[in-house]
Amino acid sequence: MKILLTNDDGVRAPGLAALAEAMGAIGEVYVVAPDREQSAVGHALTLHHPLRATRIENNIFAVDGTPTDCVNLGIHSLLSFKPDIVVSGINRGGNLGDDITYSGTVSAAMEATLMGIPAIAVSLVTQNDGGNYSAAAAFVVKLAGIVSREGLPDDTFLNVNVPDLPAEQLRHPVITTQGKRSYEGTIVDKVDPRGRSYYWIGTVDLNFSDIEGSDYNAVSRGHISITPLHLDLTNYNSLAALKRWDLT
C-alpha cells in the first residue's frame, strides 16, 4: 500500500513523525507537508504565486503552501503514482464540531476525497503539546487497514479525534456525528509602539455542546471518535421549506 501523509502543523511536527513511523508497518510512506504552521487555513489553495517544494529526505517533501496545496502537489507532481490512501495529521489539538470548517487537517483529507482517494483526518485532542501521539498513530494504522479492505462510501472521508491518553486508558472507538460549538470568539485589539492598531483573532475557551452521539461527547468520555464526513453540503432537511418560498 502506498500512503501519502500531510498535516497542517508543519513537516517537522511530532504528530506527523509519529504517524509516519507507525504507518511504515503497513505500506510505503510518503510525506508532503507544509514547511511551516498552517493551522486554521481551511481549504485554501494557493493560486496567485508559485509554490516551491524542498526534498528534505528521500520520501519527505516540505511545501511553502497550505495542506490542500500539499495534497495537490503531491498527487499531481511530486509523486509518480496515485496513493492508495491519504492520511492527514496527527493534528495537535482536536478538530471537533463546527471547527472542522477551519481545519487545514480536515481540508487536506477532503481534497484527497475530491480526487477519489480514500482519506482520513486524525487529531489528538489536547490543550498542550500532547504526549500520546504514538497511541493515536497505532489506532490509525488499524483504521487505515480497515479502510483499505472495506473501502469508504462515495464522497466520504473520516474525521478521527483521539483523546490525549495512553493507549491502555483509551476507551473503545465509536462512530459519531459532527458536534456543535458555541462561538464566543474574542478580538484582542491593541496599539503598537508606532500608534497603529493591530488585532488577534481567537478565543480562550472552546465551548462544545455535549450532544449524545457527537464527536465531542465521545472524546470527552475517553472514546476515540470516528465521524464520517461527505462532500455534499446540501441541507436536505431544508429543501422542502425553501421550495415553498415565492421566488418569482
From Swiss-Prot:
Enzyme Commission no: 3.1.3.5
Class in the EC hierarchy, top level: hydrolase
Entry keyword set: Cytoplasm, Hydrolase, Metal-binding, Nucleotide-binding
Residues annotated as binding a divalent metal cation: 8-9, 39, 91
Subcellular location: Cytoplasm
Pfam families per record: SurE
Catalytic activity, reaction form: a ribonucleoside 5'-phosphate + H2O = a ribonucleoside + phosphate
Functional description taken from the UniProt entry: Nucleotidase that shows phosphatase activity on nucleoside 5'-monophosphates.
Protein known as: 5'-nucleotidase SurE
